[in-house]
Design a protein with these regions (language model features):
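Regulatory and interdomain segments flanking nucleotide-handling catalytic cores
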Residues: 1-280
Length: 280
């Protein structure tokens, strides 16, 4: 190959294109983000759960919901976030984030999550009054990093919801274990199943279901939903009712119902599914 700008440029673009992967817009797309070394980041924060960390994660999830084109559902729990992208009933054609280009999808979502978390963390620091706690928060500023992966779900919406069920179940199990480690030694809870830890907590008057906030038990799930709002008609100069869309969180009873499902096809019978603007 002759070293001219055009020759090298064309060759590099050819190789880049050969290695580029596109996600299939006709199948549900799952994007999963994790905080890199999340366990190290939370070291020194309040145990077993830190409200500042939960708040920053929630704000990060909401920003991803707003910025990732095609997202219909965003879930966060602990230090991870799951985004589902699929066809909705409004648009005839579904155009996913960056047209489904895999490398751009994972690099941009990781960058958005990293930037938004650190932005939220700084806001929390600025309003924190406890000087000792504030110094702990400051020591972690700009150290949050997220990685991202994206893939197509084989199957249909049930399989996509199953991936969500799996992550939510994992978060709730870990939550019980974390509360257990607050009141018992590692030796006392070692090798115990989740329900056994919950029973031990009940025996000493610390019921997981009552003592832990919803966001620390299950995380939170944001769904893009239509609602009737107000708009202005410039022709008639009147206020009119218009359909708008926004992101809404999920009450605890809906997440409990979702986690209680034991058969794949029954996921479509849940309130969470009813809220989705899903199109086959």
């Amino acid at each position: 190959m002759k070293l001219t700008w055009n020759e090298v440029s064309n060759e590099m673009k050819r190789m880049e294109k050969a290695e580029s992967t596109k996600l299939n817009p006709n199948k549900t797309i799952v994007i999963r983000l994790d905080m890199r070394s999340g366990g190290s980041f939370v070291r020194g924060l309040n145990k077993p759960f830190d409200d500042s960390f939960s708040e920053a994660m929630e704000k990060t999830a909401k920003e991803l919901a707003k910025q990732v084109q095609g997202a219909q559902l965003v879930y966060f729990g602990s230090d991870e976030i799951t985004i589902l992208l699929f066809k909705n009933k409004v648009k005839k054609e579904f155009t996913p984030f960056f047209e489904g280009k895999l490398q751009k999808t994972v690099s941009l979502t990781a960058a958005i999550a990293t930037a938004e978390f650190n932005k939220a963390w700084l806001e929390i620091i600025n309003r924190t009054e406890d000087s000792e706690y504030k110094e702990i928060l400051k020591s972690k500023l700009f150290y949050a990093r997220f990685d991202s992966r994206a893939f197509n779900i084989e199957g249909g919406i049930n399989e996509a919801l199953a991936s969500l069920w799996w992550r939510m179940k994992d978060v709730s199990r870990n939550s019980v274990q974390m509360l257990g480690r607050k009141y018992f030694s590692q030796k006392q809870v070692q090798n115990l199943k989740t329900y056994e830890v919950a029973n031990k907590l009940d025996e000493i008057g610390h019921k997981w279901d009552d003592e832990v906030r919803t966001v620390n038990k299950y995380g939170n799930l944001f769904i893009r939903e239509a609602y009737l709002g107000e708009g202005y008609n410039p022709k008639t100069k009147e206020t009119v009712k218009v359909t708008r869309h926004d992101w809404f969180g999920t009450p605890e009873e809906q997440m409990k119902e979702f986690l209680s499902v034991r058969e794949l096809e029954d996921l479509q019978k849940t309130k969470i599914f009813e809220r989705l603007d899903f199109k086959e």
